[in-house]
Amino acid sequence: MPRVKRGVTARARHKKVLKLAKGYYGARSRTYRVAVQAVTKAGQYAYRDRRQKKRQFRQLWIARINAASRQNGLSYSRFINGLKKASIEIDRKILADIAVFDKVVFATLVEKAKEALTK
């Protein structure tokens, strides 16, 4: 079995890692050993934050719906309960969008929820 020298493959691997670390601060973008650590950690953060992003957006939507429904005299939980009783199925993303950009429509939704709660 012939001897294998690693020059070409090592260089390619180093280039790949340094390309991924482009734009990082200081030695993280220039030194291979530090760049490997930085790229690995960045990958871990990216993996974790792709999951957290979903949670954070849901929190934001709920906060917006809560603020808008309270302006119309109903708490968030009672508003959602009223919508369920009125059999109005709009998800929180769309509700938050309506609350921000179309206050008249949101006010009518709150009224429908109030009617369903009093029945």
Swiss-Prot record:
Q: Which Pfam family, an example, fits this chain? A: Ribosomal_L20
Entry's Gene Ontology molecular function annotations: rRNA binding; structural constituent of ribosome
Q: Which domain of life is it from?
A: Bacteria
Organism field: Shewanella frigidimarina (strain NCIMB 400)
Q: What is this protein's name?
A: Large ribosomal subunit protein bL20
Q: In the UniProt record, which is one GO cellular component term?
A: ribonucleoprotein complex
PANTHER family annotated for this entry? 39S RIBOSOMAL PROTEIN L20
Q: Does the keyword Cell wall biogenesis/degradation apply?
A: no
Q: Which UniProt keywords apply?
A: Ribonucleoprotein, Ribosomal protein, RNA-binding, rRNA-binding
The record ties this protein, via HAMAP family, to: Ribosomal_bL20
Cross-referenced InterPro entries, in alphabetical order? Ribosomal_bL20, RIBOSOMAL_L20_CS, Ribosomal_protein_bL20_C
* Family the UniProt entry places it in: Belongs to the bacterial ribosomal protein bL20 family.
Q: Which GO terms describe its biological process?
A: ribosomal large subunit assembly; translation
Functional description taken from the UniProt entry: Binds directly to 23S ribosomal RNA and is necessary for the in vitro assembly process of the 50S ribosomal subunit. It is not involved in the protein synthesizing functions of that subunit.
UniProt-listed SUPFAM superfamilies: Ribosomal protein L20 (SSF74731)
Q: Where is the signal peptide?
A: none
